Every structure is written in structure tokens, then in C-alpha cells.
Amino acid sequence: MNTISIVKILNEFDQLQNTEITLYGWIRTRRHSKTKITFLNLYDGSCLESLQIVVKNNLHNYETDILKLTTGCSIIAKGYITNSLGTKQRIELIATYIQVLGWIDNPSTYPITTKKHSMEYLRNVAHLRPRTHIFGAISRIRHVLFQSIHNLMNTKGFIWVPTPIITASDTEGNSKMFYVSELLNNSKKSQNICNSHQKIPELFFGKEAFLTVSGQLNVESYACALTKVYTFGPTFRAEHSNTNRHLAEFWMLEPEMAFTDLNIIIKIADSLLKDIVQTILEQCINDIEYCASHIKEYNLIKRLENFLHSKIIHIEYTDAIKLLSSCDKTFNNTIYWGMDLFSEHEKYLSEEYFQSPIVIKNHPKNIKAFYMRLNDDNKTVSSMDILVPGIGEIIGGSQREERLSILDKRLLENNLKTECYWWYRDLRRYGTVPHSGFGLGFERLIIYITGLTNIRDAVPFPRTINSINF
């Protein structure tokens, strides 16, 4: 049976007018008129819009089925597409056949009603929230973002590399990682991430293994052979952070490029962000407008358009600290050189002071990862954080340390064992090259594009501390 989606009906109405079609979907609303005609509002998730189906009482199951339909019921409908006689919709389907595929058990307790539900309420029914307008819009935006990133990276000459989800290495150094080794008694657990070469028979891999916090170290090995590569997949952090900015499981885009320095990757990151925003404004404008209206972020589209035409402002970390220390604003967290900036500082700089995307460069080495290239002052590393109005940091990156002796020193300074990173050190022993990369948090990007205020709404099934219900 040939079926057609609502988005195709809307886009190809001129060709489909007065032709019989078949479509599937779910009932959003049902309205019965005094003229014994029922109007069904049908959606199938292919677009924001629904399709009105006009059902006359001459259908054989009009009394037994049609008049009993409630929000959420699934149906198959056949009929003719025509111009609507009403003013609230452009087209409608005159039904010739309707079959109910699935009823709603006890409609009075169905969690998704026609009223507007709060985002907090919908998090408790994450398995049903895709049926709402807002999460349908977010899902389509996420899909286009995912596809556009792969397309853009391919166009820019990058090769995709799938990096492992299970790893023996800690990319960030001393990160809180999830164990995926088989369970051991506490007395048998190793105290260090790096085990000796002696295998532990109780462990599946013969040594401790973890869920990855980043694919960067692995993808660096491919950058040192293929020049321009990227990985894009799930990452995991076992941090005890119960905020609207943190997830235990999230996705990261991580490009890595050989023969590049910090300034080059800043340009690449800025260009990529603008290309992504441009694509989403072209392909998902209806869904973005709905998000802006639903969340009451009425300046969302203007903010995205302003970003497209903005020039990123560069500022040294040291200068950013001086600026924050001398400004009139009172912060909850004390400002001092050597601190990691908090969200309140990032938002002040990007939203209030500069009112523009900014990149903060050359952070103190003590607050950054071991793999970042040490600057000549021996105090800072060649790092960068891109901040945008609305959310603060959206990209973090650096030039990588390509000098083996300095890398070894940085590992020791971070209390990491060089033997744990033997293969990573090999990249510096065999034809080392300057190389750089960055990470773009996918859910952070979704928040920026949609105007969402809680990152738990940017992922289908959020994983956070003390919460894994689905």
C-alpha cells in the first residue's frame, strides 16, 4: 500500500489535489459538528503541521469508531486532498475510509493531553513526550543538525572516524569515569585507572575499562595519518552535577587536524558554527519559530541571524580575568587568575560586555588538560573556549602538545602514568606534527539553536545523577 507523509502532501499539493491518497498518523484532536461531520486533526511527525481530515457520517464505522476517537489514537486514512473550505487550514482530506489501528486505554489518564504541558512534567514521561508539538520540533531540528554536521564535515574535506565507546584511557585526566568492567569486590578493585600488564582474570578485558569521556585521543592517531578527521558520538561523564547544563551521557563532535595551530582551528570552528546555523535556519525555520514561541524566547531567530553576521572577538584569558575583576557587576564566585570561569562569567562576557561571540585563549595550564600545548611562558597552554550569547561556552579546543618530552612532563604534573598512554606517546615518537582540534557539545548546540533552558530537553532520554528511568 503506497502511503504519503503530511509534509509531502503540503509540499506537493498542486500535484496531489483531487487524487486519492493513503496516510497514517495519530489523532491530535477530534471535533464533531452539528451537521454530523467530524473533523480530525492528524499528525505523523514529518512536520510541525497537522492535516485536517473531514469525515462524513456515511462511513460504515462512523458511529462505532469515528465518534469514539480520542487524542493519541492511531489510524490509517484514505481520501481525496482538496482545498479547505475553512479559514484555519489551507488544505484538507475528505475521507473515504478510516481504520483505527490503536486505541488509547482510558483516555482520562492519558499523560499527553491537548493542553500545554510544562517541560518539567514532560521529563517524567520522556517515552511519550515526542508526541507533543515542542518535542516533535526539537527532534526534527536535532535530525537536521546531525545530518548537516556530517555533510558539512565531508564538504570541508574531513574523514569520519568512529572512536571506541569502551576505553582504557582517560582523555581529560582524572575525570570521573563509568566502569564497564565486570563487578569486583571492593578489596579486589584496583586503585588506579592504569593497571599493570598482568591480567586480572575477573575482568572481561583483563584490565579496567571505562565508558569514554572523549574520542579525542583516539582520533588524534588518525589525524596524524589522514590530516583532517573527526569523530561524532556519545561520551560519558560520571560527575555529580545536578544542573540544567549537565548530562551524564551526551554527544560530542570532535574534529582534529594535523599541521594546524590554535588560530587556524578557531577560524574553522567559527566557520563551522555559522554554516550549521545557516543550514538550520534554511531547513527548519517553522520548527525554530515554534520553539521560540513555546519557550517564549522571542528574540531567538534574531539572535541566530545576528550570530551569522558577527565577527568573533578574541580575548586572552588573562585579559578576561582583568576585565571581570574591574567590572561593576557582582558575581557569586570570586575572580582570580588561575580559576576556571563559571557560567555567570561566561554569560556576562558574551551577553553583556561584548554582546557578541568571543573566544578566550591561552588558559592557565593547571585548569586545562595534559594534552594541550604548553606556551613559552610555561604558565599557560594554547587553548581556546568559544562563548556565544545565550549559553556561554559552546566549543572548547586547543593545539595539542606534539613534543614528547613536554607531554611526559605534563602527564606527571597531572599524576598520570606515562605507561598508560604509551600508544598516545608513540604519535610523538614517530613523525610527530603540530596538530589541533576542538569539541562541540551536540546538546549544547541544540540548546543554542532552539532556545531551550534545560539540557535534559535536548536529548531524547536524559541520563543524570540519580535518574535513569527509561
From Swiss-Prot:
Q: What keywords does the record list, in alphabetical order?
A: Aminoacyl-tRNA synthetase, ATP-binding, Cytoplasm, Ligase, Nucleotide-binding, Protein biosynthesis
Reactions this protein catalyses: tRNA(Asn) + L-asparagine + ATP = L-asparaginyl-tRNA(Asn) + AMP + diphosphate + H(+)
Specify the enzyme's EC class, one word: ligase
Residues annotated as transmembrane: none
Database matches in CDD domains: AsxRS_core (cd00776), EcAsnRS_like_N (cd04318)
> Principal place where this protein is found?
cytoplasm
Q: Which InterPro entries match?
A: Aa-tRNA-synt_II, aa-tRNA-synth_II, aa-tRNA-synth_II/BPL/LPL, Asn-tRNA-ligase, Asp/Asn-tRNA-synth_IIb, NA-bd_OB-fold, NA-bd_OB_tRNA
List the GO biological process terms: asparaginyl-tRNA aminoacylation
Where is it located? Cytoplasm
Residues of the signal sequence? none
PROSITE patterns per the record?
A: AA_TRNA_LIGASE_II
Give the Enzyme Commission number. 6.1.1.22
Q: Enumerate the GO terms in the molecular function aspect.
A: asparagine-tRNA ligase activity; ATP binding; nucleic acid binding
Any one GO CC term of this protein is: cytoplasm
Q: Which NCBIfam families match?
A: asnS, PRK03932.1
Looking up PANTHER family in the UniProt record yields: ASPARAGINE--TRNA LIGASE, MITOCHONDRIAL-RELATED, ASPARTYL/LYSYL-TRNA SYNTHETASE
What family is this protein classified in? Belongs to the class-II aminoacyl-tRNA synthetase family.
Partners and quaternary state? Homodimer.
Question: By what name is this protein known?
Answer: Asparagine--tRNA ligase
Give the originating organism.
Answer: Blochmanniella floridana
